[in-house]
From Swiss-Prot:
E.C. numbers: 2.3.1.180
Name of protein: Beta-ketoacyl-[acyl-carrier-protein] synthase III
SUPFAM superfamilies, A to Z: Thiolase-like
GO CC annotation, single: cytoplasm
Enzyme class, broadest EC rank: transferase
Localization of this protein: Cytoplasm
GO molecular function, one term: beta-ketoacyl-acyl-carrier-protein synthase III activity
Keywords: Acyltransferase, Cytoplasm, Fatty acid biosynthesis, Fatty acid metabolism, Lipid biosynthesis, Lipid metabolism, Multifunctional enzyme, Transferase
Function: Catalyzes the condensation reaction of fatty acid synthesis by the addition to an acyl acceptor of two carbons from malonyl-ACP. Catalyzes the first condensation reaction which initiates fatty acid synthesis and may therefore play a role in governing the total rate of fatty acid production. Possesses both acetoacetyl-ACP synthase and acetyl transacylase activities. Its substrate specificity determines the biosynthesis of branched-chain and/or straight-chain of fatty acids.
Length: 323
């Protein structure tokens, strides 16, 4: 039985760090107000010359190097983003060029904050279906470029960055002790699309638009949706919350993370938190948190890791992976 095993991981962040106090001269807010409601203390903001493609390519190079591979070993470059460099061609193709890859194929996937979870699921299907042996899965965003910097309810929440993993086909035994992707579950419900969206686009306003969000509505639905899809993953594998070594959630809001972990009965010390230093980086959120926990030695080979995310649409999903 073929499994999709994580071979390497990498990340990249813009140079500029914007602290909560930096917003005090832009909108009516304070460090205390932001921390109390979100857990965010700072975030990275892309500067001149830093784009979704440049950040994604940097994270990709780091992941390929960490895997001990060459760019030419990659069969598929799969980029999760909702802030591409251009409407077309796909930013994944631009990253493919930046890496010097002239074989295989590349495309973008857009599921907003759930994008990396959707991308891992897609990559796993390509690998298990025999269409690719090694897939570079990237989550990269520059949300700072679609924010309304006069809206204090949204501009303080988001940051920019990128994370990437290399998934590789490996023989498994069909057991939950196997390394690799053990289960994936995806969901969406378009009835909620007006609760979190961008008010522009090439086919409607011919503009980029700005992010709009009904924060209370998102919070109201988030915990239930997240825990339901995770419980479905447990049911599919026979695993339980007690088996989880590390819970790596989408880093949108610490209150949502805490409430989800509590409902799932996952101990606080098993939850990876980076929202305080990254803010909400959308599709880059989960791989950035993963890369942080791998780099500091928390996540080790053989650990059972639970990933989840929820984003605009609504879209949401979960992945269980044996590291």
């Amino acid at each position: 039985m073929i499994r999709s095993v994580v071979r390497g991981i990498g990340s990249a962040l813009p140079k500029r760090v914007m602290k909560n106090t930096d917003f005090e001269g832009i909108v009516e807010t304070s460090d205390e107000w932001i921390v109390q409601r979100t857990g965010i203390r700072e975030r990275h903001i892309a500067g001149e010359g830093e784009t979704t493609v440049s950040l994604g390519a940097a994270a990709a190079r780091a992941a390929i190097e960490n895997a001990g591979l060459q760019p030419s070993d990659i069969d598929l470059v799969l980029l999760a983003t909702s802030t591409p460099n251009n409407t077309f061609p796909a930013s994944a193709v631009a990253i493919q060029r930046e890496l010097g890859i002239t074989r295989g194929f590349a495309f973008d996937l857009q599921a907003v904050c759930s994008g990396f979870i959707y991308a891992i699921t897609t990559a796993d299907l390509y690998i298990r279906g025999g269409m690719a042996r090694r897939v570079l899965v990237i989550g990269a965003e520059t949300f700072s470029r679609i924010l309304d910097w006069t809206d204090r309810t949204t501009c303080v929440l988001f940051g920019d960055g990128a994370g990437a993993i290399v998934l590789e086909a490996a023989e498994g035994h069909g057991l939950t002790s196997d390394r690799g992707i053990l289960a994936t579950n995806l969901r969406s419900d378009g009835n909620h699309k007006e609760k979190l969206y961008v008010d522009g686009g090439p086919s409607t306003t011919q503009t980029v638009g700005h992010l709009r969000m009904e924060g209370r509505e998102v919070f109201k639905h988030a915990v239930g949706m997240i825990t339901d899809v995770i419980e479905a993953s447990f049911e599919a594998t026979g695993l339980t919350a007690e088996d989880i070594d590390w819970f790596v959630p989408h880093q949108a809001n610490k209150r949502i993370i805490d409430a989800s972990a509590k409902k799932l009965h996952i101990a606080e010390e098993k939850v990876v938190i980076t929202v305080d230093r990254h803010g909400n980086t959308s599709a880059a959120s989960v791989p950035l948190a993963l890369a942080t926990a791998v780099a500091d030695g928390r996540i080790k080979k053989g650990d059972l890791v639970l990933l989840e995310a929820m984003g605009g649409g609504f879209t949401w999903g979960a992945v269980l992976v044996r590291w």
